[in-house]
């Protein structure tokens, strides 16, 4: 994903990308019988949900703050060039992105999300939970 932080006083004001790593923590009761006995969720199901809900729309996209005129102008140019964009109504800090991802996933009735950990670099992450 690529983004920028309009108005930031450092290098993050420039368009740049990250190879994010997403960690999803779930909780819930174990299935008592059937193919999923002793599981909260089959990890392949979890992976499919995360792919559909988060990765497919956001991977290799310019993630931009729709409330920023500058970022919206950049997104419009990229859209004219048939580049992938994904608009959100907030500044695209790792903290806000973690909250956004948590909230998108918590609406899936198959999941009971406990926390999201979003790694922006190999040594820096933020976590969101409710």
Q: Model segments located where?
A:
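Charge-rich, low-complexity N-terminal segments
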Residues: 1-130
